[in-house]
Swiss-Prot record:
Mg(2+) binds at S101, D242, D244, D246. It comes from Rhodopseudomonas palustris (strain BisA53). Binds 1 Mg(2+) ion per subunit. Its EC number is 5.4.2.10. This is Phosphoglucosamine mutase. One of its GO terms (molecular function) is phosphoglucosamine mutase activity. Catalyzes the conversion of glucosamine-6-phosphate to glucosamine-1-phosphate.
Length: 450
């Protein structure tokens, strides 16, 4: 069965477009019915980021879950990885994060976690989707069996203690000046406080959410403001989270951006030296730079690639027995600690290496020179541009030109009507020509189908 609602990271779309109160309530009902197993009171924890539409969606989800007899524990603004962690620690049957991650405020989404804090499998999502298009009136709870909802206090402290426990007890961030950019999102309270408790000299930006400014010219997708602040304050490092704090990008003391591939290299090498890698390998996606793969090979570390999406990274980690994986966008999964990407915990692992080595971040976090890589998006309204004959011809030509000297990747986005074209190789001019040729053919095919 094709997926009508769920994309690569839950259900996501424009608030009051795809993501309406009606849909959110139905998601609550459907997910509640799927996860009611056994004759006991069932509970769901719900967190959110700082988007204006979060109130609307939260209220609708509460109506849906309580109408099928599930109790609801409301966490308020919390990072996605905190919701996953609290789902497990609070013995909930289900966890929900209301967020569109790195998107701007106009969008929102619903991410679901199972009782152990993992994102749902494709099969469970299909079960929920099937119920979304059914009339559930006859499956609602009796009046005396309706669920209750209440807000939970103290959850920030629980996440802070969890994050601090991922570092050795004798490791302090004393003497480290850190600029943290919380993207005006879910981590705006909890992460600066955690850094302060660890001893860092903390300078915070992106911590004044107003419902509209989440990810706006800030956070991991726009690290320019962080870069300027790091240089201005003569800081040692900058940390940029996205709106729900499941991804992270760093900035060194010179203001240079450190992406997820470099972070994977830093952590992988450190963990290998300390004997902490569960096996001599990590998991990355097809988007990770070939330079990372070559660096890891040079240190005896295998890199296994998956499709784009942290859920696929985690699946491969679990089936293959790996404890480190991630994406260049900054989704870093450390399965010794978390069941999903955790931007803050990943940043802490890098800070630990910096403190251990006593060297500048620019030296610690520049492990390899990335191969020239170009990524372009082609938007389309209708049709299937990838089936066009001219597009197929351009792709074949590109593969031949890069053969043995690079990679070519073309894939539709899982969250929007966009085709992503990525190429990388030793010769930048060739890479540019290949990408431009394919994008031109895709653009013409998309225009013809519109």
């Amino acid at each position: 069965m094709s997926r009508k609602y769920f994309g690569t990271d839950g259900i996501r779309g424009r608030a009051n477009g795809l993501i309406t109160p009606e849909l959110a309530m139905k998601v609550g009902q459907a997910a509640g019915l799927v996860f009611q197993r056994g004759e006991y009171r069932h509970r769901v924890v719900i967190g959110k980021d700082t988007r204006l539409s979060g109130y609307m969606i939260e209220t609708a989800l509460v109506a849906g879950f309580t109408s099928v007899g599930m109790d609801v524990l409301l966490l308020g603004p919390m990072p996605t990885p905190a919701v996953a962690m609290l789902t497990k620690s609070m013995r909930a049957d289900l966890g929900v994060m209301i967020s569109a991650s790195h998107n701007l405020f106009e969008d929102n989404g619903i991410k679901l976690f199972g009782p152990l804090g993992f994102k749902l499998s494709d099969e469970v999502e299909r079960q929920i989707e099937q119920l979304l298009d059914e009339c559930l009136d006859k499956r609602l709870a009796a009046s005396a069996s309706l669920g209750r909802a209440r807000r939970i206090d103290g959850v920030h402290d629980r996440y802070i203690e969890f994050a601090k426990r991922t570092l050795p007890r004798d490791l302090s961030l004393d003497g480290l000046r850190v600029v943290i950019d919380c993207a005006n999102g879910a981590a705006y309270k909890v992460v600066p406080e955690a850094l302060w408790e660890l001893g860092a000299d903390v300078i915070s930006i992106g911590v004044e959410p107003d419902g509209f400014n989440i990810n706006k010219e800030c956070g991991s997708t726009a690290p320019e403001a962080l870069s300027r602040k790091v240089r201005e304050m003569r800081a040692d490092i900058g940390i940029a989270l996205d709106g729900d704090a499941d991804r992270v990008i760093l900035v060194d003391e010179r203001g240079h951006v450190v992406d997820g591939d470099q972070l994977l290299a830093v952590i992988a090498q450190s963990w290998q030296e300390d004997g902490r890698l569960s096996k001599p390998g990590i998991v990355a996606t097809v988007m990770s730079n070939l330079g990372l793969e070559r660096f890891l090979e040079g240190h005896g570390i295998e890199m296994v690639r998956t499709p784009v999406g942290d859920r696929y990274v985690l699946e491969q980690m679990m089936t293959g027995g790996y404890n480190l994986g991630g994406e260049p966008s900054g989704h870093i999964i450390l399965s010794d600690y978390a069941t999903t990407g955790d931007g803050f915990v990943a940043a802490l692992q890098v800070l630990a290496v910096v403190q251990k080595l006593g060297r500048p971040v620019s030296e610690v976090c520049h492990k390899f020179d990335p191969l020239p890589q170009i990524l372009k998006n082609v938007r389309f309204r209708a049709g299937k541009p990838l089936d066009d004959a001219d597009v197929k011809s351009a792709i074949r030509d590109g593969e031949q030109r890069l053969n043995g000297h690079g990679r070519l990747l073309i894939r539709p986005s899982g969250t929007e009507p966009v085709i992503r074209v990525m190429a990388e190789g030793d010769d930048r001019d060739v890479v540019e020509e290949v990408v431009d040729s394919i994008c031109s053919a895709l653009g013409e095919a998309a225009a013809a189908a519109a």
